[in-house]
Structures are given as structure tokens and as C-alpha cells.
């Protein structure tokens, strides 16, 4: 990628003409001398609410997930960016472990409070990582090792059409 990024307080003045500015509440990321930039608004319209929004729209996220078939697996739904934007494979596995939920559980057998707990865990884990407080993974890429909570052997296998590898503890994630 060409160009140079800087992150600064929003109140800081800028000299020159930036190529791209991404504004947060207190800070902004500025790209100088960037490459060709194309915005695809139609693609953005299909993306669900951002798990890192401040605050995240948990009600809308839960409502989006609830529109899915009851037999769809929770772990697969959390990776669907149309439902909830931002959760990747690592955060899916770790959030479900924190919430004690199996990635294989059907959505129809998952209570709203459980779904919210998984979404809140994902948001907290991701925010912590952005702030430099990333803790050691409990299950992600730890197949065959002992679960740090219950001692059962962590398992892994592909899930969904994309066959993304799910890591989970069969002892404490139900």
C-alpha cells in the first residue's frame, strides 16, 4: 500500500491535503498520498451493525440473528457480516468460549440473553485488543490442549459453507 498513515486527536490541525480521513469520536486516522480510493456504498448497505460501535447496537444485532433459520448454527451466524459486522474467526471462537456457548448450538436453542453475552464478549475482546490488552487465547488454535477453565480437550473442525475452523471446549461450551 502506498501513502502514509497518522493517528491523531481530532482537534489537531492538519497542513496539506489528506487523501482519506477516518474519524472516531476523539481521534482520526489520516492517510496522506494514498492510492486510488473507491467507495462501494451498496456493499456497505448490506453490512450489519458494527460490533465495535460505541455503543454497539446489540438490539439490532440480536434482531438480525433472529431472522435467520432456527437450525442455523450460532458459530456460523456470528461470522455472517450481514448480521453483525466485524467478528472474525478468532473473536468468534474466544467470545463463544467466554459466554460458554457451543458454536454448534442451533440459533433456535439460544436465548437472547446468551446471544447478547456472546456479542458483548466479542466487543470487549476486540476493544481490549485494540487497546493493547490482548490476552492469551483460551481456545483459538489450541486444539488438543486442555481448556483453561475445565480441563477438557479443546477440539476443532470446519463450520459453515466457508468451512472456517471452529475451536471450542466440549466440556464447558454447551
Where are these regions (language model features)?
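Structured catalytic/nucleic-acid-binding cores of DNA maintenance enzymes
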Residues: 1-174
